[in-house]
């Protein structure tokens, strides 16, 4: 007999919605628990079975914490701006707002069909003007503090998309979305000064409970390195340039320098003989993305400019080259090369016949670069010193001679914040005809995205908003001065950089959120999502949070106390699920056939939450069979509670019940859901072996199962005679003393040989044990007719009888 999942799931979903069961209780006297999912982008494809894995994990925690007496905040919303909706609108002629609205309805329906305990009164949508009013407000504050600025920067321009994309969205020289060619070109862009927060973004990783691998990814992305800036003069000119090096101690071994091809200086210093080669190389470089140019696996290429730099430590002239692996946007856009001690510089020098001079003893530079340590040689005042001593001495020398100084450099670049697209938050800025720029006054926010039927990219590098004259052109009512609105929009990262704050106070018309409420709910206690957001989203959100902390808007230094990345659910063939492979599993189909509780149970039982595991239909069937077994254990053929559930407790299930409460509670808290489910299975197996099922144990078991399989949990709770939902029924507790074995197995030996075993009460005296041993049938057989010489009894362990 199996239960009717369709009826039961519909019934309880209606009940929860009608009774607002999961509304957040904001009781200041209770402890809080804020469980957050990375909110989804509502795509046209709807939910896939990968989404519910993380959502089920936070839901189990939220349901358990409610029962444990916590105020639980468990919200859901939509990260709904972004390229896919715009691309769809361009392809079909439909309005991206309509498309997005429809997708959200599908997502919400699918999410509700899975029984998640979200507080829908707090639902947010990044495309709602009442929401993006505050995204724009944060931008104006960044602008006021000098952290939002305009700059001419070389950007990744994608002609087919008609927009600029960030470095992180370029994969192997192609756009991540669509796989189109990326071209480098200079454009006016809005930038956010995330570099001002580099040190704090690094240091404060110590404050949070995150996977070490994610912390390392952030550390590497920020890429802090200590070294020195060194100034090189260009021979025969007034020009000079600066290089950053982490090894100033090797300056005597610098035999050439390399400039980024796009530096203005290159054109000024290139000799007529080299002009054609240099220009051709610059043209070639403009077609490559930054990631492509800095790929460590590719061979270094370059062209000689014909000019020479003067090495400041020895006055020697060394050639100046250009190379695409040096970026104008990274460091100073120039490097010094010490080929004797760098493998790639060594290859380059060998290829182009450049001098190689060793300055650290220990290798054989006729065969390869030496990258180990050793005393300095060929280095004048550094000779004989080790690395640390030589770096310190060279830094002093550079400063004394005014040709360099100690410096800290970062890999992190400022955040390119503008997109030449329609479907994003308008940047609240006006450019006036007198050359000044102001932000839109706070009283006029939100600056709404105008409705238009023509969202094609302008093709000029400006966004489609540039085509809407009546929106773009403004006149200052006080002075009559004319101005134009900023036509770039914000990137999709903007709305997701602060959404966790709005969930705390989503209907506040006067501020992002009430400070007292923020004090009560922050930081987020558990944040679960995919590892693909390890760097960007988390770094951007931490940056905005720190800025808001500095201006007194939020009370904590960090937004997310604990972060957890769920693994990926792969297709049955162990490949990533994707439409093109045709291996995507739609949760609607699973819910229809097996039920939402089965899907939830299966995804939590597949393996550890952070592992990537292949989908398996057999596993689904196994999960459904377990729920049917639970149903049959408690419910008879007429749908009523079984007679064997009784108030009589013969003690046979006591130990396994208390073990189950302990293990399930601890495993759920530690996100070890697969082992929690295993323990529930152990209990069911034991319960099926006994005649009488104590009512209190069955109730407790149902409560433990309910966070994982909430619909069947509620139904069984009702069948057990309870009228109210079990949402807030106090969580079961276990008795430590019941976990202790009250019986032990004692071994009986005769003359040192095992002759029998028996379970006895724990803690019996030697005399009592001796008596039991002497009366044991097998022992009696072996001592019959013999004289007992000695009895050795070890309490709770053994009795050895010596007889002959």
From Swiss-Prot:
GO terms for biological process: leucyl-tRNA aminoacylation. Keywords: Aminoacyl-tRNA synthetase, ATP-binding, Cytoplasm, Ligase, Nucleotide-binding, Protein biosynthesis. ATP binds at residue 579. A motif ('HIGH' region) lies at residues 40-51. A motif ('KMSKS' region) lies at residues 576-580. Coiled coil: none annotated. Its main location: cytoplasm. One of its GO terms (molecular function) is leucine-tRNA ligase activity. Disulfide bonds: none annotated. One of its GO terms (cellular component) is cytosol. Its EC number is 6.1.1.4. It catalyses: tRNA(Leu) + L-leucine + ATP = L-leucyl-tRNA(Leu) + AMP + diphosphate. It is found in: Cytoplasm. InterPro entries: aa-tRNA-synth_I_CS, aa-tRNA-synth_Ia, Leu-tRNA-ligase, Leu_tRNA-synth_edit, M/V/L/I-tRNA-synth_anticd-bd, Methionyl/Leucyl_tRNA_Synth, Rossmann-like_a/b/a_fold, tRNAsynth_Ia_anticodon-bd. It comes from the Bacteria. Belongs to the class-I aminoacyl-tRNA synthetase family. This is Leucine--tRNA ligase. It comes from Enterococcus faecalis (strain ATCC 700802 / V583).
